[in-house]
């Protein structure tokens, strides 16, 4: 639910109900989650954003924002179009907060093409407890990203992130994670080539993860997108090596209200226990907009 007081601001309250997930060794499906048995409804997003002059936007969140939620663009066109959560650059989740807590962010358009974004998230539990507060929460993260957005051939960005969630990485050591990442998209009109690479340093080791993809816009149908991307995902606890995933998808707009996206996904989770983790998946997503 979006509402506005001035026409330039936004108050968003997003409710979500979900049960189970899919592709959990690879981050699940995009925008999926588990709110418990019987499709319990929870507040997934609750934030307010407003402009400060002509070049600055401020966002204050009670819950729901972390990682790439604070940036103007994630650069790669297959983020959001793909069905798997890995379609979004995975370093944003791996380097962000372990949960979507309270936080604040700023977006500053330095010029018409250069934008710098910064955001801070205090993960639950703690952020929602007045006795603890957002600056004393157990898990905290912050991000800064400089983006070049052109409306033309080249879009690119460099991001730095820091969090207190080293325990999620292979080895399970408590401590911090520092992330350095680059993203790029080359737009040839209706054809694009894009990808990202991220080096993440945690307590006890480091990790390099990446994806790359190609795609066609308006293939056979106006407003459609066909794409294939794949790469090496972050190596968390329980993985012997970095998981691999490849997805092919075709986003089809049936009308102004309905978009259908079928996808074929191949993943190799590389579990430490040696179980069968090399699998093909099929998925289809329906998106209704009103």
Per-segment meaning from a language model:
Residues 112-113, 137-141, 147-248:
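Detector for outer-membrane/organellar transmembrane beta-barrel domains
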Residues 1-125, 147-151, 211-235:
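Outer membrane beta-barrel
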Residues 24-31, 126-135, 166-175, 271-275:
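Solvent-exposed loop segments that connect transmembrane elements
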Residues 103, 263, 283-285:
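Terminal short linear interaction segments
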Residues 20-22, 67-68, 125-126, 165-167, ...:
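Flexible loop/turn segments at secondary-structure boundaries
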Residues 243-280:
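Internal helix-turn-beta structural module
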Residues 278-290:
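Outer-membrane beta-barrel "beta-signal"
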Residues 34-36, 92-94, 132-134, 146, ...:
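Outer-membrane beta-barrel proteins
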């Amino acid at each position: 639910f979006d509402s506005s007081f001035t026409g330039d601001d936004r108050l968003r309250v997003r409710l979500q109900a979900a049960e189970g997930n899919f592709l959990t060794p690879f981050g699940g499906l995009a925008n999926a989650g588990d709110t418990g048995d019987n499709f319990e409804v929870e507040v997934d997003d609750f934030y307010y954003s407003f402009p400060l002059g002509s070049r600055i936007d401020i966002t204050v969140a009670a819950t729901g924002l972390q990682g790439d939620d604070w940036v103007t663009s994630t650069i790669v066109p297959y983020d959001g179009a793909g069905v798997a959560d890995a379609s979004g650059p995975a370093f944003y989740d791996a380097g962000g907060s372990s949960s979507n807590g309270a936080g604040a962010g700023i977006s500053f358009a330095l010029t018409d093409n250069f934008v710098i974004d910064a955001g801070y998230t205090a993960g639950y539990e703690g952020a929602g407890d007045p006795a603890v507060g957002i600056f004393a929460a157990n898990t905290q993260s912050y991000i800064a990203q400089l983006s070049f957005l052109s409306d033309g051939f080249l879009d690119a960005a460099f991001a730095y992130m820091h969090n207190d969630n080293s325990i999620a990485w292979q080895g399970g050591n408590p401590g911090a994670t520092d992330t350095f990442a680059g993203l790029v998209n080359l737009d040839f009109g209706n054809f694009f080539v894009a990808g990202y690479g991220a080096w993440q340093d945690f307590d006890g080791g480091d990790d390099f993860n990446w994806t790359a993809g190609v795609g066609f816009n308006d293939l056979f149908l106006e407003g459609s997108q066909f794409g294939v991307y794949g790469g090496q995902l972050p190596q968390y606890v329980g993985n012997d090596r970095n998981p691999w995933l490849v997805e092919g998808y075709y986003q089809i707009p049936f009308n102004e209200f309905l978009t259908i996206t079928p996808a074929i996904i191949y993943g190799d989770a590389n579990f430490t226990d040696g179980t069968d983790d090399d699998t093909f998946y099929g998925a289809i997503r329906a998106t209704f907009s009103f």
